[in-house]
Amino acid sequence: MTTVTQMKCACPHCLCIVSLNDAIMVDGKPYCSEVCANGTCKENSGCGHAGCGCGSA
């Protein structure tokens, strides 16, 4: 059996892959940052991770 250790950030605008050990969990969903977890990544210029672009228009 395979154990999942990483998943895509649950934010629909984000492209980040987040380790489940380091993720910010909200309602059982993994997020890469506080701004993605609280749904404000667009308003806050993205999550700040290189290459993501979730803060882009």
Swiss-Prot record:
<keyword id="KW-0186">Copper</keyword>
<keyword id="KW-0480">Metal-thiolate cluster</keyword>
<keyword id="KW-0862">Zinc</keyword>
<dbReference type="InterPro" id="IPR000518">
    <property type="entry name" value="Metalthion_fam14_prok"/>
</dbReference>
<dbReference type="GO" id="GO:0046872">
    <property type="term" value="F:metal ion binding"/>
</dbReference>
<dbReference type="InterPro" id="IPR017854">
    <property type="entry name" value="Metalthion_dom_sf"/>
</dbReference>
<comment type="similarity">
    <text>Belongs to the metallothionein superfamily. Type 14 family.</text>
</comment>
<keyword id="KW-0479">Metal-binding</keyword>
<protein>
    <recommendedName>
        <fullName>Metallothionein</fullName>
    </recommendedName>
</protein>
<comment type="function">
    <text>This protein complexes cadmium, zinc and copper.</text>
</comment>
<keyword id="KW-0104">Cadmium</keyword>
<dbReference type="Pfam" id="PF02069">
    <property type="entry name" value="Metallothio_Pro"/>
</dbReference>
